[in-house]
Amino acid sequence: MIIKLIFLICFKIVLSIDNKTKFNETLILDNIDYWVKFNDTITLDSNITSEIEAVSWNFYNNTFNLLAICGKASNFCSCSNYSTSFFNITNNCSLTIFLIDETLFNTTYQIVYSTNIINYKINLLIPVTPPIISYNCANCSINCKKSNGTNTNIFLSINDTIVTYTNESILNYDYNCSILNNNFTVTCIINNTISTSNTTEFINCTNILLSSYLDFFQVTSYIFYMIIFIVTGITVSILISIITFLFIRKRKHVEEIESPPPESNEEEQQCHHDTTSIHEPSPREPLLPKPYSRYQYNTPIYYMRPSTQQLFKSYSLPKPCPPPKPCPPPKPCPPPKPCPPSKPCPPPEPYSPPKPCPPPKPYPSLPSIPLPPDIPPLSTQNISLIHVDRII
């Protein structure tokens, strides 16, 4: 055991001294990729054929770090400085990895011996899920995209015939529009070493021309409605401007007509002399037209006298009215006429006794009705009085 430790120490010293000088002379033997599931175990072969060899295992995590130092003699390999929780080294100096931690994946493990270097990259293998199919009838293209999974292969099948495949994440395929019909079935298959999945879709490109026409008509209708909206807005703006201009012009004309002409001083003096009397026009006085009404433009034109225009000034205040005349005192009411004396009541008429009633007249005797000879007397007949009355 002591001899083994001395041999390993000497090997480490020699390796550290000659590593820089021999590194440029080493030959990279191979780069190998492994796709492994979580919780699996993998063994990286050392490929050592000589009887006596010095071996070192490294792992790459941004930089290469020493994992273990081994020495092989005959069929025995002794190593040190490695974690037995995740790793184990066989008698051939091969490295066994227990993939129970995610940090062990996507890592490169390197073995160095003699003048050879082998790089092993461990990748995590994820199961696949159904792919996604998309197509464009106008460009005659089909796309098949991976949704999930690692180390995958994608196959494209048209009408149950595989036409192309790839190991990339997306498969693009341009088909011949003149050869294929407008209706066909597309199947996209994706798989890896642990799972497989597929998606099938029926493609119908018969209505591509109709859909393009519909898109054109839709855009045209949008443009048409936009033009109508713009033209309508411009027309309404022009009409509002014209109506506003005519209204302002008409109002200005009415104000010019309603404004009174300048009056002379004689008319003012005359108004001061007698404000209560109304000036009677003379036959020679001109008559001015009455201003137009703002609400009735088709009514006949009336004329007013010049002297009365002073009464319609908007800025002149009316003269105060004279005080009202006092009301005359009310006339006294005449005395009421005396009532005439009441007439005496006439004496009551004397009561006359009622006349005695005359005695009742005797009823006439009933005539005797002779009975027929064949009818027996009433005493012998069994006839009720009611029946007799009915017979009578």
From Swiss-Prot:
Membrane topology summary: Single-pass type I membrane protein
Signal sequence region: 1-16
Disulfide bond residue pairs: C137-C205, C144-C188
Residue spans crossing the bilayer: 223-243
Compositionally skewed regions (Basic and acidic residues) per UniProt: 269-283
Any one cellular-component term (Gene Ontology): host cell Golgi apparatus
Keyword Iron-sulfur included in the entry's annotation: no
Database matches in InterPro entries: Ig-like_dom_sf, Ig-like_fold
Binding partners and assembly: Both glycosylated and nonglycosylated forms interact (via C-terminus) with the host AP-1 complex.
UniProt protein name: CD2 homolog
